[in-house]
């Protein structure tokens, strides 16, 4: 791995900080990130809806989707794909890894 590749991974916090009950808002590489936990898996996506630019970390989570708090459109947490109107454009998702109990995201 090159230094540039290593630099793209940013710390988000300890794995215990992330619960299924509540999405978490973080900033990594000057980008707003929403972190979601589904069971034992963690997912990260850009923390702005592609339709109304609302914070997805403030949305309601159910059945693997987050509901935009502004217009109630649904976005698949795993893929960022829009699931219903008014959202038509996907939201960028980011890879996550866990290193020694710490969650990291690659925003490169």
From Swiss-Prot:
Name of protein: Anthranilate 1,2-dioxygenase ferredoxin subunit
Family per record: Belongs to the bacterial ring-hydroxylating dioxygenase ferredoxin component family.
Induction note: Expression is positively regulated by the transcriptional regulator AndR.
Cofactor binding, per record: Binds 1 [2Fe-2S] cluster per subunit.
Gene Ontology MF, one: 2 iron, 2 sulfur cluster binding
Function comment: Part of the multicomponent anthranilate dioxygenase, that converts anthranilate to catechol. This protein seems to be a 2Fe-2S ferredoxin.
Assembly: Part of a multicomponent enzyme system composed of a reductase (AndAa), a ferredoxin (AndAb) and a two-subunit oxygenase component (AndAc and AndAd).
Keyword Disulfide bond set for record: no
Entry binding sites for [2Fe-2S] cluster: 49, 51, 68, 71
Pathway where it operates: Aromatic compound metabolism; anthranilate degradation via hydroxylation; catechol from anthranilate: step 1/1
UniProt record, GO biological process: anthranilate catabolic process
Residue ranges annotated for the Rieske domain, each copy included: 9-105
Coiled-coil stretches noted in the UniProt entry, renumbered to this chain: none
InterPro entries: Rieske_2Fe-2S, Rieske_2Fe-2S_sf
Entry keyword set: 2Fe-2S, Aromatic hydrocarbons catabolism, Electron transport, Iron, Iron-sulfur, Metal-binding, Transport
Pfam families (alphabetical): Rieske
Names of required cofactors: [2Fe-2S] cluster
């Amino acid at each position: 791995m090159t230094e540039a590749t290593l630099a793209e991974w940013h710390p988000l916090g300890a794995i215990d900080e992330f619960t299924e009950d509540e999405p978490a808002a973080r900033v990594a590489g000057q980008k707003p990130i929403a972190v979601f936990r589904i069971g034992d898996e963690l997912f990260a996506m850009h923390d702005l809806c592609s339709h109304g630019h609302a914070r997805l970390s403030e949305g309601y989570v159910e059945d693997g989707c987050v509901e935009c708090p502004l217009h109630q459109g649904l976005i698949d947490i795993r893929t960022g794909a829009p699931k219903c109107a008014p959202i038509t454009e996907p939201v960028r998702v980011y890879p996550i890894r866990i290193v020694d109990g710490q969650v990291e995201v690659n925003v490169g």
